[in-house]
Amino acid sequence: LDRAAMAVATRNTGYPVVALVKQLTALAGPDAGRWTHWGATTQDIMDTAVVLQVRDGLALIEAELRATCTGLARMAAAHRDTVMAGRTHLQHALPVTFGYKVAVWLSPLLASLDALPRVRERALRLSFGGAAGTLASLGDQGLAVTRELAKELDLAEADIPWHVARDGLNEATCWLGILCGN
């Protein structure tokens, strides 16, 4: 693939898919090339690519989050009897233990870990509906193609095409915001 040509074309169209499909079609030749973009829209391809990136990113974040939680849990246990001054309104308060303080840091991170399966369920869905979201170009094979594509990409099938319904990706973004806020 000519990445430089793809970069120029992407700047012109705003979508890398157009240039990619053009090159893949040329590489596939006239017989196979006509099927390169069959059934899917540019939006389907872009959204599915984003979902694949989100999936990989969430896996990396989960690994780091689990390691952080493990470290904090160990620290909380190790310092469960280490007394320190509590703080309230930027002033000394009643004594607490450092282990308690660390457990307070740990608690919202564990809540984020608990929420992650639901975030994945909502965000990691295949986008595949075709031009109008009806899979019409695939005839009576639309649902079967969707099922196989979702299986191949290890993504959930969407109940309905989500070209304009961004809630799943929004939930993943909100989850990240909550995690970072903690």
Where are these regions (language model features)?
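TM-loop-TM module centered on a large, flexible mid-protein loop between adjacent transmembrane helices
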Residues: 144-169
